[in-house]
């Protein structure tokens, strides 16, 4: 059950997710290695961790055709590998009534699909996302924008016949047939950042304290509606 509706004073219930008798538990294997260091009687600390995690029978909310009466079905769609590095540097400093605790952390996390259901090459999951072996989950799969047509003379004849004019967007014609359609979609980046981190500081003086926390991430793609 996934949705409800009131009609003529009566409560209704609608099914949005189809059942799956073949559904299996995910299976995961993970390896970790790390190091913890402390200097100057604990005033400075450093932690480093690395991990690799392989997941099989990956669970995913797979879209289903609207003609089925459902919007999605939970399926085992393939296998995935996650790997990453995490570093934390900490400081505990103080003198008299004053103390300062600081932590800086940064993480580099990657994932990629290593196998797909029924050996499919690609599985489209929405109008702008798809799953493909070797690509990260969370990748954008869409037609690539290249700029703006400055004049009608630039426009290929077939595209001009479709009503495209100067001032309209230029999209990359992947298959080279002068027709922009679903076959021209490609992977254009990932919503997953290359690295994330945070910087935390707590200052204390007698009965007063001040805390500040900053977070950051870099090089992830965003889609604007």
Model-identified regions with their sequence ranges:
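Repeated loop/turn-to-beta-strand initiation elements of outer-membrane beta-barrel proteins
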Residues: 42-46, 85, 96-97, 207-212
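Glycine-rich, aromatic-lined ligand/substrate-binding cores of catalytic
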Residues: 190-224
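Residues that define the transmembrane beta-barrel architecture of outer-membrane proteins
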Residues: 27-31, 81-85, 98, 193-197
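Solvent-exposed loop/turn elements at secondary-structure boundaries
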Residues: 1-26, 45, 49-80
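Transmembrane beta-strands of outer-membrane beta-barrel pores
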Residues: 50-56, 91-93, 106-112, 205-207, ...
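Residues on the lipid-exposed face of transmembrane beta-strands in outer-membrane beta-barrel proteins
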Residues: 33-37, 48, 87-91, 199-205, ...
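Extracytoplasmic loops and strand-loop junctions of Gram-negative outer membrane beta-barrel proteins
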Residues: 13-19, 68-73, 88, 179-187, ...
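Conserved small-residue
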Residues: 75, 94-190, 222
């Amino acid at each position: 059950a996934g949705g409800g509706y009131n009609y003529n004073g009566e409560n209704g219930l609608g099914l949005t997710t189809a059942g799956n008798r073949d559904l299996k538990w995910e299976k995961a294997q993970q390896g970790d290695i790390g190091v913890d260091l402390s200097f100057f009687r604990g005033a400075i600390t450093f932690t480093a961790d690395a991990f690799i995690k392989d997941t099989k029978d990956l669970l995913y909310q797979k879209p289903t055709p609207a003609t089925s009466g459902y919007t999605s079905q939970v399926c085992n769609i393939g296998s995935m590998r996650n790997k990453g590095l995490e570093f934390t540097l900490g400081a505990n400093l103080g003198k008299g009534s004053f103390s300062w605790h600081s932590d800086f952390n940064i993480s580099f996390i990657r994932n990629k699909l290593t196998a797909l259901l029924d050996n499919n090459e690609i599985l489209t999951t929405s109008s702008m996302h798809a799953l493909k072996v070797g690509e990260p989950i969370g990748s954008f799969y869409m037609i690539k924008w290249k700029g703006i047509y400055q004049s009608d003379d630039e426009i290929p004849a077939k595209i001009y016949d479709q009503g495209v004019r100067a001032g309209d967007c230029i999209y990359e014609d992947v298959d080279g047939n002068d027709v922009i359609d679903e076959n021209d979609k490609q992977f254009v980046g990932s919503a997953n950042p290359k690295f994330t981190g945070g910087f935390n500081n707590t200052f204390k003086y007698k009965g007063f304290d001040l805390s500040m926390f900053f977070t950051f991430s870099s090089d992830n793609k965003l889609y604007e509606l």
